[in-house]
């Protein structure tokens, strides 16, 4: 789960991490009042959406007086902000963060991530802050500093000092940096984060350390332990079909293609998307109905796929184990009758009760095409959508 910058900064402050003074606002009038409360200029008006690259897209601007705050807030609120993370359709801006301007001496990059390869938490930082860190890592990997932390041991002073020295921080900034890292690590572990990122982390003119930006992702599987974190969820920032799928415990991710697919098992779903692309088509979604799905879940999954107007054909790829083929077939038939099947469907089924499943589909009278194997299924659905 993602949250907004202003929400992440609230959490940072709770763990003693310095952040600029600021206030979230939802209208131009509120933005003006927030700027007046801050008192000093310049102030920064920042679009709040769940995506990076807001500055390059025109979603972060500096205001030198109240009139500029009013003008900038009016321009950003309601705009369709397009960044490299939103896709070409962009994301509508419905809220802003108005915060104090700072005397910035240096911009740094800081993050805490989970390294699954080593089963460790990694503190990652760089002197190349305020930039696209992916580009920095690709072009100048030597600028990326990585400090692995054993989660059983936790972050220690030497971890923090190692990062501070390699960042070439001035002596006066090292102690506040260590305190900040310890607070961020504790928050990362306490709240089950999967990613914590500050870009930029700034060194001020008086050698202070302040989190100028904030990005946090939480492990969805651990949210049941954090009712307070769940309250930060902003459904307006999420894909509506993904929100709908989550109500039925379906693992659904919308994509940009035109071949809808329904699969049981995440690995099989990814392999199915790969073979769809190899056949010359593009998947419209990832949908894992799970091994223990029932007819109702299958029906809901099918309905969600059909709700995507980009879908021109559907590939159903099921290996019947816990989810029997006859259960899947019944769910597909019920969903198609309720929603109205208006696109061709290719079905590849193997496993438990496969013959019964094929019989149910064959007698349904629906626009269905059978396939012998996955390669055959992908080729048929690719031909349909071309």
From Swiss-Prot:
GO molecular function (one): magnesium ion binding
Binding site for ATP: 46, 53-55, 99, 102, 107
Annotated binding of Mg(2+), by residue: 199, 213
Pfam families: ATP-grasp_2, Ligase_CoA
GO CC annotation, single: succinate-CoA ligase complex
Cofactors, names only: Mg(2+)
Sorted UniProt keywords: ATP-binding, Ligase, Magnesium, Metal-binding, Nucleotide-binding, Tricarboxylic acid cycle
Sequence positions that bind substrate: 264, 321-323
Source species, domain of life: Bacteria
Gene3D superfamilies tied to this protein: ATP-grasp fold, A domain, ATP-grasp fold, B domain, Succinyl-CoA synthetase domains
UniProt family annotation: Belongs to the succinate/malate CoA ligase beta subunit family.
Subunit annotation: Heterotetramer of two alpha and two beta subunits.
Record protein name field: Succinate--CoA ligase [ADP-forming] subunit beta
